[in-house]
Amino acid sequence: MTSQLHKKGEAWSARFSEPMSELVKRYTSSVFFDKRLALVDIAGSLAHANMLAAQKIISADDLAAIERGMAQIKGEIERGEFEWQLDLEDVHLNIEARLTALIGDAGKRLHTGRSRNDQVATDIRLWLRGEIDRIGGLLNDLRGALIDLAEQNADTIMPGFTHLQVAQPVTFGHHLLAYVEMFTRDAERMRDCRTRVNRLPLGAAALAGTSYPIDRHAVAKTLGFDGICANSLDAVSDRDFAIEFTAASALVMTHVSRFSEELVLWMSPRVGFIDIADRFCTGSSIMPQKKNPDVPELARGKTGRVNGHLMALLTLMKGQPLAYNKDNQEDKEPLFDTVDTVADTLRIFAEMVAGITVKPDAMRAAALQGFSTATDLADYLVKRGLPFRDAHEAVAHAVKICDDRGIDLADLTLDEMKQELPNVAHLIGDDVFGYLTLEGSVASRNHPGGTAPDQVRAAVKAARAALGK
């Protein structure tokens, strides 16, 4: 027997009467994308080797050789010197082959009590756990940038919209804090998902467990897992944790996409609420005047990409019988790309938000259009004893009259207002105009969750405290 796995087939070649087709080698190889698991693969192997030695399954000398060889391999990978071989199919066999070349028979003993089925499941969980932590930090960075911008604009008034029609005045700070809430829930989902990712599959072997006297709990403790997967079949075959992460990521990107849609709209010259820093925009190859919000536009597009990965993983798993099937090799590229897309998007958005220039005059001018304080007039009448439905009808009549005349409700004199609303004229006094100002409207929503500037400042304080936890 040779001292090294020179080719993939040498891991099982005694069973077959002809070599593997070159086309099949290329078709089934995953090393050029799963090699990003190399460092966690080494970490898992070292934990496994230490357990084998502690259980007297391999010798202390074998363990020392494995640790020495893995240290060299890790250095080669980190320096970009490791030679990845297509013939060895995947990250696991590439590392095992190199280890065996370096230390001989001790390298062959590493795989005792282990299958690539539980090995790869462990690698993915180890890797994903770290990426979830990284994404959690990036979500916090974006939340922090939004909180800072909200605090700066606690008093900045803009129109709030429903159906993209002007609805009621809100503060820009309040609007931004809505996204803070969304991204806070995203961070909570990531933390919750992590609890199910953080279970150790190693020890399940191919599907049924192993006859060696292994200590799975010791390996779990070494690798920082909260516990072990309780069923060997489930441990090697399911990828629901990856699906759950991708679903949580799709929600992150959905929230990013909604925010992107508004950024594109707000930056449009027709709206002009904000400006995005030049370093996040591009120009046109033909139109010299253009400044295009490519980053938020591309984020909208990349949301579809992540949603597609979620569908790919769901479809991948839906038809598989227990236990492991080769189909599961296709779990990695959607998962890897989801992580890359979400992480890159969050990082660039945190930087972009910090560089947004707000145009409060344009926001205020827009809030003065579309009768945004009509509800405040209705509330004014209700507080004087008129049933809300009657108040609603009376104000709708006044809005129509003002719309026909091309003026706002606040432009009516007191006499004109009483004349146009004869049925409620006795309820209208000089104080009505305080209700029709933008400042009066937002200030009146002075309750937790409301848009009043004082509430926005309180919400900013609470959000910042939550971020510090």
UniProtKB/Swiss-Prot annotation:
It is found in: Cytoplasm. Pfam families: ASL_C2, Lyase_1. This is Argininosuccinate lyase. One of its GO terms (cellular component) is cytosol. Belongs to the lyase 1 family. Argininosuccinate lyase subfamily. Pathway: Amino-acid biosynthesis; L-arginine biosynthesis; L-arginine from L-ornithine and carbamoyl phosphate: step 3/3. Disulfide bonds: none annotated. The keyword Cell membrane does not apply. The keyword Transmembrane does not apply. It catalyses: 2-(N(omega)-L-arginino)succinate = fumarate + L-arginine. Its EC number is 4.3.2.1. It is an enzyme of class 4 (lyase). GO terms for biological process: arginine biosynthetic process via ornithine; L-arginine biosynthetic process. GO terms for molecular function: argininosuccinate lyase activity. Keywords: Amino-acid biosynthesis, Arginine biosynthesis, Cytoplasm, Lyase. The gene is argH.
